[in-house]
UniProtKB/Swiss-Prot annotation:
Self-association state and partner proteins as the record states: NDH-1 is composed of 14 different subunits. Subunits NuoB, C, D, E, F, and G constitute the peripheral sector of the complex.
Entry superkingdom: Bacteria
Class of this enzyme: translocase
GO-annotated molecular function: 4 iron, 4 sulfur cluster binding; iron ion binding; NADH dehydrogenase (ubiquinone) activity; NADH:ubiquinone reductase (non-electrogenic) activity; quinone binding
Gene giving rise to this polypeptide: nuoB
Keywords assigned: 4Fe-4S, Cell inner membrane, Cell membrane, Iron, Iron-sulfur, Membrane, Metal-binding, NAD, Quinone, Translocase, Transport, Ubiquinone
Species whose genome carries this gene: Neisseria gonorrhoeae (strain ATCC 700825 / FA 1090)
GO terms for biological process, alphabetical: aerobic respiration; electron transport coupled proton transport
Cellular component, GO, one term: respiratory chain complex I
Cofactors demanded by this protein: [4Fe-4S] cluster
Family note: Belongs to the complex I 20 kDa subunit family.
SUPFAM superfamilies documented for this protein: HydA/Nqo6-like
Record lineage: Bacteria, Pseudomonadati, Pseudomonadota, Betaproteobacteria, Neisseriales
Name of the protein described by the UniProt record: NADH-quinone oxidoreductase subunit B
Amino acid sequence: MGIEGVLKKGFITTSADTVLNHMRTGSLWPVTFGLACCAVEMMHAGMARYDLDRFGIIFRPSPRQADLMIVAGTLTNKMAPALRRVYDQLAEPRWVLSMGSCANGGGYYHYSYSVVRGADRVVPVDVYVPGCPPTAEALIYGLIQLQQKIKRTSTIARDE
């Protein structure tokens, strides 16, 4: 947990940032935004073989109950406003994971007139998971990278 010092008599000293970030990494609640074949791999990651619950990751049906959005698949121009609307409904602090080549940069359909060339043109993306489609292991690795990123962030504002 990043303990800075241990005092005598059983007291532990640490920063509030460390405690808050530790709690946030152990309770990511993603809402799924499955648009194409990558969504099937996302479903595999939630099933018994990979079991995202062991990381504290529980899929939520509503964006108002979630703090992470997993964008999986080809994002079209018609779907971009809906993606932004779902992102705006996420609870703060919120994170976005872009899953698959199509969500990362348009993928196979990059030159199509109707495809957005990356989810990062609509919402800020924190972690990119490459692949077409990426495996469930790759998604889990991306989620672990997001947890590491959350642990490194400053939560409480400091006067400098």
